[in-house]
Amino acid sequence: MVQRDARPPFAAIGGAVSPEFAALPTPCYLLDEAALTRNAEILGNLSRRTGCRVLLAQKAFRNYDLYPLLAPHLAGTEASGLFEARLGAEEMPSKEVHVFCAAYRADEMEELLQYADHIVFNSPAQLAKFGPAAKAAGKSVGLRINPECSTQDGHAIYDPCAPGSRLGTTRAQWDAAVAADPALPALLDGLHFHTLCEQDADALAVTLDAVADKFGDLLSKMQWLNFGGGHHITRPGYNMTTLERCIRRAHQDWGVTVYLEPGEACALNAGYLLTRVLDVVQNGDTTIAILDTSAACHMPDVIEMPYRPPLLGAGEPGEKACTVRLAGPTCLAGDVIGDYSFDAVPAVGDLLVFGDMAIYTTCKNNTFNGMPLPAIYARRPDGTTREITTFGYSNFKHRVGK
């Protein structure tokens, strides 16, 4: 029943289910090696053209078995804390490890200094508290800034520049901190901003203007400037020309090395979630297919963002003959993936394939309601598959006890 689908999430598989898919267990994440490599090559070519340094933001994708595909094209990894920093150091050895956290724990700092090369602090207070030790350990020290420039519509949960944001230091906060402690500027090697979410380079250009206006005098004294993440660099149609102009502007105006730390761009359209239909029920005019996967457990951003993930061969509601609501088997009434249309109602046992499932899935999933974690497989460039890991009852049990 699945027809050829030319949309970007499915282009790598020719827009159709291959025989290898049918043999895989469900639910199952299938990570596409060729698509990951293609994304990494785009990022690597950007680095070569502009001199910028690109990091993998592990918060979006940390399937380290596939790091060897990414590492040749990247400068290293970005971490949000101790565990991600350690993972980056272990799985991309000899590469840079950068870390940013809204607040660091004192009892973790000594170990963190073993793994991180760059440490970015969120506030002047944290910079004053931990910056001297980081400098003494030979680390490059940065401060996350808040340029107070929102470029997002409808995603306040992902807007670090929203009023009352806890993320980043405003210029007023910095000036007040320096007035109280004039030694703070000497601790800094670079500045970091992260204000985008799944955006094009025009939003970056607007943000960079704000950064220049509020922090330009500081940047001339810095070694590096980190543009953060949220850049959809590998998305078809992304404005690479504007991105490169922003990078070159930072080089020319302030003499800094530019870092980018995309997460989604590294693994965009490079994964699938395979699932089968368990039951089909009718409630009034609504046809509901209950799947062996769960939005709440296996693709939590569907509910958190929220958004409706692409589904191979399916149309928008009303586009095809039969509109069906796809939902999970948990007790959560809102465990709904979305409404899709098909030529015919999916039958029990039918295989469905969701696209763009490499990002914010395996790193965020959970076992609510006792839902098993999906197996993780990789798809080789020749179309064959290999098992990366599987999960069972012990994984569920041991998260809450010994």
Feature annotation, model-predicted:
Residues 194-196, 225-234, 262-265:
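Glycine-rich beta-strand-to-loop/alpha-helix junction loops that act as flexible
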Residues 52-224, 246:
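Active-site-proximal beta-alpha core segment in soluble small-molecule metabolic enzymes
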Residues 149-151, 197, 233, 266, ...:
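Feature marks short, surface-exposed loop/turn motifs that line or immediately flank catalytic pockets
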Residues 7-94, 99-104, 108, 294, ...:
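N-terminal capping/small domains of soluble enzymes
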Residues 205-210, 239-246, 275, 341:
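Charged helix-capping and loop-helix junction motifs
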Residues 251:
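Active-site neighborhood of glycoside hydrolase catalytic domains
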Residues 19-24, 190-194, 228:
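A short small-residue
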Residues 246, 257-402:
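Charged (often Lys/Glu-rich) extended helix/loop segments that serve as interaction or gating elements
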